[in-house]
């Protein structure tokens, strides 16, 4: 896909594929992400459910559309400000992240699946602690997959429908149990806010699942990148701070995002009408030759590194500080304990938006 990105940046940086406008250059992608007045995140009405049903797919309306991800100001600002303090770097549970990381690593043998044994449980256990919920890793992962993918084959409708109902029931139960009580966790803060019930459910579900899916991808991608590009010694000597940023740029957990135009706009030589969908290819922007020197090389100490993997503008990822913290500690502790001898098996996620591994089996020796 990266060869296609390079070709499109050169030949058709603003490209209409018959349904959606696609942007490939860093400058254009960042401009759209920063301009919420002309490029909206509110995509209500743009999910063609009939087409999905005809193609043997089933769509479930999960209340995550009632969140800061899919809203514009002033609602967006109200939603974001509700929990912003909890994701301030100075308020993050650093000691707990390290404690969980060390425990998970201590349980691993000489050959293991990085994703299942480490990259999945770590962010789920951390966000569960912050939300004040029982950390059921398997259930939260199942729900995360359901919301992240949002599509299921028609022959899976009953199992997917059951998971969906479990997710909604769980969110309502947790929120209801905290209404009118002292606020001691993020769930309590949401439950006792002035948001509508749908907004509360959407907010709770977003916090529970949004970060863990992308952080899992980040950790898995970074372990592969550090192994393939011989970066583990750098991490042991200098720490993982800059190397995590390079993993975010080189192998972004999310390949692209989407906006809808609120008025007629012109990008380069292309005029885009109001109400058109615009696909922002973050993965392509992160390899733009005009911004990044030697963009197709993995350089663990790359400076500066203005990648767009956490977005930009008002929708800059709220959980970015937490994801960075989890990834940095995870990779530094991993480097202290192990040396990767071989990547035994890997299986990519089959998804146009999410970029990561379903399975990443490594063979290691003690460092």
UniProtKB/Swiss-Prot annotation:
It is found in: Cytoplasm. Its EC number is 1.14.-.-. Keywords: Cytoplasm, Heme, Iron, Metal-binding, Monooxygenase, Oxidoreductase. Coiled coil: none annotated. One of its GO terms (cellular component) is cytoplasm. It is an enzyme of class 1 (oxidoreductase). Active up to 80 degrees Celsius. Thermostable. The keyword Acetylation does not apply. It comes from the Archaea. Its cofactor is heme. Its main location: cytoplasm. It holds the Pfam family p450. Binds 1 heme group per subunit. One of its GO terms (molecular function) is heme binding. The keyword Glycosyltransferase does not apply. InterPro entries: CYP450_119-like, Cyt_P450, Cyt_P450_B, Cyt_P450_CS, Cyt_P450_sf. Belongs to the cytochrome P450 family. PANTHER family: CYTOCHROME P450 YJIB-RELATED (PTHR46696:SF1), P450, PUTATIVE (EUROFUNG)-RELATED (PTHR46696). This is Cytochrome P450 119. It comes from Sulfurisphaera tokodaii (strain DSM 16993 / JCM 10545 / NBRC 100140 / 7) (Sulfolobus tokodaii).
């Amino acid at each position: 896909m990266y060869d296609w990105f390079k070709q499109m940046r050169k030949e058709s940086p603003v490209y209409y594929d018959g349904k959606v406008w696609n942007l490939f250059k860093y400058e254009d992608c960042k401009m759209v992400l920063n301009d919420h007045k002309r490029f909206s995140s509110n995509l209500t009405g743009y999910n063609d459910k009939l087409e999905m049903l005809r193609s043997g797919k089933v769509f479930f309306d999960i209340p995550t559309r009632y969140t800061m991800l899919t809203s514009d100001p002033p609602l967006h600002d109200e939603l974001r400000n509700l929990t912003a303090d909890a994701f301030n770097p100075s308020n993050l549970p650093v000691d707990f992240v390290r404690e969980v990381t060390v425990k998970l690593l201590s349980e691993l043998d000489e050959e293991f699946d990085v994703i299942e044994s480490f990259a999945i449980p770590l962010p789920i256990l951390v966000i569960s602690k912050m939300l004040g919920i029982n950390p059921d890793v398997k259930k939260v992962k199942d729900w995360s997959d359901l919301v992240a993918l949002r599509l299921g084959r028609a022959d899976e409708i009953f199992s997917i429908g059951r998971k969906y109902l479990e997710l909604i029931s769980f969110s309502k139960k947790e929120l209801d149990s905290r209404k009118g009580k002292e606020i001691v966790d993020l769930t309590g803060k949401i439950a006792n806010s002035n948001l509508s019930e749908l907004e509360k459910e959407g907010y709770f579900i977003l916090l529970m699942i949004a970060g863990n899916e992308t952080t899992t991808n980040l950790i898995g991608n970074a372990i592969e990148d550090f192994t393939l590009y011989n970066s583990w010694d750098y991490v042991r000597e200098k720490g993982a701070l800059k190397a995590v940023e390079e993993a975010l740029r080189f192998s972004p957990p999310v390949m692209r995002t989407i906006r809808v135009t609120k008025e007629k706009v012109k990008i380069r030589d292309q005029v885009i009408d109001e109400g058109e969908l615009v696909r922002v290819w973050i993965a392509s922007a992160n390899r733009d030759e005009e911004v990044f020197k030697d963009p197709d090389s993995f350089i663990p100490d790359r400076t500066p590194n203005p990648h767009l993997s956490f977005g930009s503008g008002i929708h800059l990822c709220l959980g970015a500080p937490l994801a960075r913290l989890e990834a940095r500690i995870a990779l530094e502790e991993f480097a202290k304990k192990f040396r990767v001898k071989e990547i035994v098996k890997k299986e990519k996620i089959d998804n146009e938006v999410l970029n990561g591994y379903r399975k990443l089996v490594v063979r290691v020796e003690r460092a």
